[in-house]
């Protein structure tokens, strides 16, 4: 990245540390930037921290300009663009937001399911906690995401499972009354009460999980 930007690797690293020093999660870890971190860095942080979609769109476009890459429809189909597009048309903005969200969420969880720890990337989805269609401001926010395998993504999306305030899996009552197959028992019944694996960054937003429990979970 430093070579592309015309900066030394150490200069790029320190700039990123400056931004990290504004992040409450990193401040708890005592991450500190330069003592003279400029007001410009703070202004950029404040602007984009409250607008994940804007940050995503501008940063992804900037990266493509720097790297000279162009996304094709074929390339995008190879990626699992999990959320449904509600605008009726796949605009460039939507594609970039979806791509950023998926990569940010999955990388935060080390490319493994936060429930069962399956680590086959082809079997993973970046699941929105508050559904894509319900809150535009949350669409690109990685804290509104969980890395889930295909089974648990589907169950979470349909309200068959959720997480409590302590990040433990809760299974809907209906799931417990259905005829039990081996997969049903291992994949759903036995995960109840299990604490999900939390990421080092972009920890799931507590208010988003509360929304899921109240509005999505089947109870």
What residue spans do the PLM features occupy?
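Short Lys/Arg-enriched helix C-cap and helix-to-coil transition segments
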Residues: 24-46
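Short, charged surface segments at domain edges that flank catalytic/cofactor-binding sites
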Residues: 75-118, 130-143
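C-type cytochrome heme c attachment motif
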Residues: 8, 111-115, 151
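Major-groove recognition helix of helix-turn-helix-like DNA-binding domains
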Residues: 7-23
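DNA-recognition alpha helix
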Residues: 1-6
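The −1 position to Zn-ligating cysteines in a subset of zinc-ribbon hairpins
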Residues: 112, 125, 148
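Charged, alpha-helical interface segments at or near domain boundaries
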Residues: 44-93
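A detector for short metal-coordination/catalytic motifs
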Residues: 100, 118-121, 130-219
């Amino acid at each position: 990245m430093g070579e592309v930007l015309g900066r030394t690797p150490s200069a790029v690293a320190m700039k990123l540390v400056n931004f990290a020093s504004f992040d409450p999660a990193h401040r708890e870890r005592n991450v500190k930037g330069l003592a003279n971190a400029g007001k410009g860095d703070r202004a950029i942080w404040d602007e984009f921290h409250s607008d994940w979609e804007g940050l995503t769109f501008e940063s992804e476009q900037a990266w493509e300009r720097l790297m000279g890459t162009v996304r094709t429809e074929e390339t995008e189909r190879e990626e699992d663009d999990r959320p449904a597009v509600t605008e009726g048309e796949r605009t460039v903005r939507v594609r970039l937001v979806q791509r950023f969200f998926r990569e940010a969420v999955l990388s935060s969880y080390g490319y493994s399911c936060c429930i069962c720890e399956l680590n086959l990337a082809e079997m993973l989805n970046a699941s929105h906690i508050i559904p894509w269609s319900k809150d535009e401001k949350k669409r690109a926010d990685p804290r509104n995401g969980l890395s889930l395998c295909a089974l648990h993504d589907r169950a979470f999306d349909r309200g068959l499972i959720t997480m409590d305030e302590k990040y433990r899996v809760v299974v809907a009552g209906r799931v417990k009354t259905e005829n039990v197959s081996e997969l049903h028992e291992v994949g759903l019944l036995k995960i109840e009460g299990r604490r999900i694996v939390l990421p080092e960054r972009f920890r799931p937003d507590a208010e988003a999980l509360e929304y899921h429990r109240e509005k999505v979970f089947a109870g």
